[in-house]
Amino acid sequence: MAFTFKQFHIDDMNCGMAVGTDSVVLGAWAQLTAAKTVLDIGAGSGLLSLMAAQRSQAHITSVELDTSAAEACQHNFHNSPWANRLTLVNSSIQDFCQQIEYQEYFDHIICNPPYFEQGTQAIQSQRAMARHTDSLSFAALLDAIHVCLAPQGNASLILPMQSMARFNEILAHSQLSLIEITNLISIVGKSANRVLCVLAHKTHPQIATKISDITIRELSGQYTQTMVQLIRDFYLKY
């Protein structure tokens, strides 16, 4: 399926996961404007990378394991206004991290990671790989962020609320800390079902976690004003 945003176009036909609200919100919410280098882990169609390119002057490295998704991603990069700032690497993030050098630390890392535990069935194999934590466990993701993130850098993720307890358990044994969370609420009156997270290298003393909420839709089904402000630079409707 193809999606046209204000400044770029996405074809996600060969990608395991289609363009969705989670990635759009993450790409619009992440604090990228000051970053000179950005790493997109599990780039898929390249949506997060393209949003980062639109919102900053950063050079962006996009790592995607699946070959078909990587081809679609490269196509989308080539057809964008920022092709000279976008680099695709068809590799696992684990292999990529083994090759990284000090000079390649990233100011910001963005990732919409797999979120289904082993045993949950997905219809297509690509979709299964994109959605199952088996392809990138939380422990492996946090290790990759620790290796690739610049000393003063941040990493922005989006996770299901039901995965947060497990994520925090693994995070507690890592070299990273959670410095900000924004609870994402699908509609007024509901409980949050997604969490936007900002990670940084651990400091002493620890920084208190900043907490906030974003509600996506009013009871009428229309986007809230907060959501409109977040996505207005991307959606044609606004």
UniProtKB/Swiss-Prot annotation:
InterPro entries: DNA_methylase_N6_adenine_CS, rRNA_Ade_Mease_Trfase_CS, SAM-dependent_MTases_sf, Small_mtfrase_dom, tRNA_Adenine-N(6)_MTase, tRNA_adenine-N6_MeTrfase. Keywords: Cytoplasm, Methyltransferase, S-adenosyl-L-methionine, Transferase, tRNA processing. GO terms for cellular component: cytoplasm. PROSITE patterns: N6_MTASE. Its EC number is 2.1.1.223. GO terms for biological process: tRNA processing. It catalyses: adenosine(37) in tRNA1(Val) + S-adenosyl-L-methionine = N(6)-methyladenosine(37) in tRNA1(Val) + S-adenosyl-L-homocysteine + H(+). It is found in: Cytoplasm. GO terms for molecular function: nucleic acid binding; rRNA (adenine-N6,N6-)-dimethyltransferase activity; tRNA (adenine-N6)-methyltransferase activity. Belongs to the methyltransferase superfamily. tRNA (adenine-N(6)-)-methyltransferase family. Specifically methylates the adenine in position 37 of tRNA(1)(Val) (anticodon cmo5UAC). This is tRNA1(Val) (adenine(37)-N6)-methyltransferase. It comes from Shewanella baltica (strain OS195).
